[in-house]
UniProtKB/Swiss-Prot annotation:
Residues engaged in binding FAD: G8, A9, G10, H11, A12, G13
Record organism: Chlorobium phaeobacteroides (strain DSM 266 / SMG 266 / 2430)
UniProt cross-references to Pfam families, sorted A to Z: GIDA, GIDA_C_1st, SAM_GIDA_C
Subunit annotation: Homodimer. Heterotetramer of two MnmE and two MnmG subunits.
Protein name as catalogued: tRNA uridine 5-carboxymethylaminomethyl modification enzyme MnmG
Subcellular location: Cytoplasm
Any one GO MF annotation of this record: flavin adenine dinucleotide binding
Function, in words: NAD-binding protein involved in the addition of a carboxymethylaminomethyl (cmnm) group at the wobble position (U34) of certain tRNAs, forming tRNA-cmnm(5)s(2)U34.
UniProt keyword NAD, yes or no: yes
Keywords from the named record: Cytoplasm, FAD, Flavoprotein, NAD, tRNA processing
Family the UniProt entry places it in: Belongs to the MnmG family.
């Protein structure tokens, strides 16, 4: 018998099995194709707005995704650099093939993991708890816990024009049949979602004189806190072009053969990542849409056409592509397509990702209604950790909304009504000023170490960094600069420099003051800093904390206020039917979602402030 069985080796499954194995659990990873581990079936990229923050949080908790993209990335950029630090988001283009090879190698080299190439079509359940996984042959593999990371494979159906056929993730991969029906027989409620992917083109057929080059950052920052530098990495360029009105007219000619508009697609698609035909239908007044041409690897001619996701007929796809500047003679390697698949409404999971209906069964990734590699990987990591902790009879590991984007993600899943593929945005995180990509290790490394996924070396490295930040902050608070030095530091600034000596910490709160300039201006300050550290990441943390100090203090007060509600647990057996004073909608939503705390209950749509007041009185202040 295995401790933990993981079904599916996509981004959720990989992080789940690695997290569990690294905590000492005996694990089995079951996947239908061992050559497709961590396959990037859609865009060949990791990170982006909010997703980059999640990737660095995964790294801080001992996950693998950040290391994988550092090793296999072909272009690195920091998005939103012109905005405040809370909005900075790392993103990298990946070598799609190498990413999969890297992740398989890591899994094969990890102790405590066995691999089986097969498919899970059912669960062995006894007395309300999972006991193992059932394969198509009828064989039952016993396990103390099972984590389902099914991606888009559950009854997957691919659409290209009016043609549709079974498919699991790509056109060449079969779907998983039987598992949805097995879960429904156990009491789970399933829904249907849709996602899509654009065509791939031959990069040799692009006219580069008509497209705009988009290069990587000259001094790229690694995703992983354990990668020293990416300076040696040769980067490739992406390219930008636009659709035009002719493109839109050609696409409209295919609407009569569109599975999206004909009603053949029943699943709900992602609102914030619409297909190109949906964009021109919903925004008819917009004359053009940006198209990004992204290489799929350093050693392939295949190119991903970002912004052109479509399920229109192949002939329309090619005609429309060839109307775009730079693509007049383009060759299409693979058509775009839409895929429908089953998911399970996530009000049926706890914030540990264990299901409420079947004990020791965990859901992670698109089975919970999310989209995106990063969101899936984060769930896999948390499911793997919590499955391991439960087997060890240890306290569950739950991140709240003030601690991590991962906490926001999972809290949204268990409290909100998911009716379309969920993706993370910075706007989803009310504590985003504190949840930056640059401080993920400071926020989460200790928790990962306590959970067993972060080794002692990584933990001590982070603790040393935290100590250096405290010492440097103390130095900035105690050391002062004289007016003549301040005048030099503020040369050209709109504000008048102070006439009295001022603490460096107060000076650094001013937006025009640069830390590096102060090192040049004051030998004493430079000497004091060098005694503490030469790590630019430490400098960055001190400066950000000083410049955002007022905002961070307000955020802390809000966190403390919310924590008071989170401290009120709601028993799992609590019946809302007998509570007088609840609104009908509130009673219905609370019964459906079964929140674990009053704080969680307060975030369920349809539960009013007066409903929360009633609960506080009933459960006890």
């Amino acid at each position: 018998m295995y401790d933990i069985i993981v079904a599916g080796a996509g981004h959720a499954g990989c992080e789940a099995v690695l997290a569990a194995a690294r905590t000492g659990m005996s694990c089995l990873l079951i996947t239908s194709d061992l050559s497709a581990i961590a396959r990037m079936s859609c865009n060949p990229a990791i990170g982006g707005v909010a997703k980059g923050q999640i990737t660095r949080e995964i790294d801080a908790l001992g996950g693998e995704m950040a290391k994988a993209i550092d090793e296999t990335g072909i272009q690195f950029r920091m998005l939103n650099k012109s905005k405040g630090a809370a909005m900075h988001s790392p993103r990298a283009q990946a070598d799609r093939a190498l990413y999969s090879v890297y992740m398989r190698k890591i899994i094969e080299e990890q102790d405590n993991i066995d691999l089986v190439q097969d498919t899970v079509t059912g669960l062995d359940v006894e007395s309300g708890a999972v006991r193992g996984a059932i394969l198509p042959s009828g064989r039952i593999i016993k396990g103390k816990s099972v984590i389902l990371c099914c991606g888009t494979f559950l009854n997957g159906l691919i659409h290209i024009g009016m043609n549709h056929f079974p498919g699991g993730r790509t056109i060449a991969e079969p779907p998983v049949s039987g598992l949805t029906e097995n879960l429904q027989s156990l009491g789970f409620r399933a829904g249907r979602l849709k996602t899509g992917t654009p065509p791939r083109i031959d990069s040799r057929s692009v006219n580069y004189s008509l497209v705009e080059e988009q290069s990587g950052d000259p001094d790229p920052r690694p995703f992983s806190f354990h990668t020293d530098s990416l300076g040696h990495r040769a980067q490739v360029s992406c390219f930008v072009t636009k659709t035009k009105e002719t493109t839109h007219e050609l696409l409209r000619t295919g609407f009569s053969r569109s599975p999206l508009f004909s009603g053949k697609v029943q699943g709900v698609g992602p609102r914030y990542c619409p297909s190109v035909e949906d964009k021109i239908f919903r925004f008819p007044d917009k004359n053009s849409h940006h198209i990004f041409l992204e290489p799929e690897g350093a050693e392939t001619n295949e190119m991903y056409v970002n912004g052109f996701s479509t399920s229109l007929p192949e002939d329309i796809q090619l005609l429309a592509l060839r109307s775009i500047p730079g693509l007049e003679h383009v060759k299409m390697i693979r058509p775009g397509y839409a895929i429908e698949y089953d998911f399970f409404f996530p009000y049926q999971i706890k914030n540990t990702l264990e299901t409420k209906i079947i004990e020791n069964l965990y859901f992670a990734g698109q089975i919970n209604g999310t989209s995106g590699y990063e969101e899936a990987a984060a769930q896999g990591l948390m499911a793997g950790i919590n499955a391991s902790l439960k087997i060890q009879n240890r306290k569950p590991f739950v991140l709240d909304r003030s601690q991590a984007y991962i906490g926001v993600l999972i809290d949204d899943l268990v409290t909100k009504d998911i009716i379309e593929p969920y993706r993370m945005f910075t706007s989803s995180a009310e504590h985003r000023i504190s949840l930056r990509h640059d401080n993920a290790d400071i926020r989460l490394c200790r928790m990962g170490h306590e959970a067993g996924t972060v080794d002692f070396s990584s933990f001590t490295k982070t603790e040393y960094k935290i100590s250096a930040i405290r010492q440097l902050r103390q130095l900035c608070d105690t050391m002062k600069l004289h007016p003549d030095q301040i005048i030099s530091a503020m040369a050209g600034a709109a504000q008048q420099p102070p006439l009295q000596p001022i603490a460096i910490s107060n000076l650094l709160k001013r937006p025009e003051i640069d830390f590096e300039n102060l090192l040049v201006l004051s030998e004493d300050f430079r000497a004091g800093v060098n005694e503490i550290t030469t790590d630019p990441d430490v400098f960055e943390q001190v400066v950000i904390d000083l410049k955002y100090e007022g905002y961070l203090k307000r955020d802390l007060l809000m966190t403390e206020k919310i924590a008071r509600l989170e401290s009120h647990s709601i028993p799992g057996s609590f019946s809302y039917a007998t509570v007088s004073g609840l609104s009908n909608e509130g009673r219905e939503k609370l019964t459906l979602h079964k929140p674990e705390t009053i704080g969680q209950a307060s975030r369920i749509p349809g539960v009013s402030p007066s409903d929360i007041s009633v609960l506080l009185i009933k459960i006890g202040r």
